[in-house]
Amino acid sequence: RFAHDPMAGGHRMWQMAGLKAQRAQTDVNNKQAAFDAAAKEKSDADAALSAAQERRKQKENKEKDAKDKLDKESKRNKPGKATGKGKPVGDKWLDDAGKDSGAPIPDRIADKLRDKEFKNFDDFRRKFWEEVSKDPELSKQFNPGNKKRLSQGLAPRARNKDTVGGRRSFELHHDKPISQDGGVYDMDNLRITTPKRHIDIHRGQ
């Protein structure tokens, strides 16, 4: 019989231990890969959900804007009676049209228009500027070209730096939006703004 070789037995044990460690590491690697794959799948699903929610939010906002615009136009096209007292103004009345919420409706113009019926908001706007043209203290603040526009019921032109694209004239702004039940013909809810300021107001600036 051959003598037992203790070194050979130790070598086999070492090989078996190495194989076990290798298998264990492979198992760990496989589990890590599965975990990473699951994590990526969750991340992708979260991203897809977030994108879907954002698209839904944009769609809802778009639908709300469209509804508000339709509601606003509907109310502006309805007849109504002018209300409100306006505010006293000075000789630089429209200097405030380019800042904050704009310039107020002059009280003496409000006195002329109060309780009068208008076919729609365009009708009110024309009558408003016509009354401004008839007021000596207010009309003298405008150049000849704008005086002519006022007499025709047209809004005066703003300075070039206060215009935006084709919007070149002063505009009437509802301080409390019509879509939030702001009074269409409430002169205390109306401000005169430059086109640029009007756009900034509606952007929340």
Swiss-Prot record:
Q: Where is the composition biased (Basic and acidic residues)?
A: 53-76, 88-99, 159-178
Q: Which SMART domains match?
A: HNHc
The record ties this protein, via Pfam families, to: Col-Pyo_DNase
> Which stretches does the entry tag as region Disordered?
24-109, 136-187
Q: What is its EC number?
A: 3.1.-.-
Q: Enumerate the residues binding Zn(2+).
A: H173, H198, H202
One GO MF term on file is:
metal ion binding
What does the record list as GO biological process? defense response to bacterium; killing of cells of another organism
Name the keywords, alphabetized.
Antibiotic, Antimicrobial, Bacteriocin, Endonuclease, Hydrolase, Metal-binding, Nuclease, Plasmid, Zinc
Classify the source by domain of life. Answer: Bacteria
Record carries keyword Nuclease: yes
- Which enzyme type, at the first EC level? hydrolase
**Record's function text:** This plasmid-coded bactericidal protein is an endonuclease active on both single- and double-stranded DNA but with undefined specificity.
Q: Please state which protein family the record places this protein in.
A: Belongs to the colicin/pyosin nuclease family.
Q: What is this protein called?
A: Colicin-E8
What organism, scientifically named, is this protein from?
Escherichia coli
What gene name does this entry carry?
col
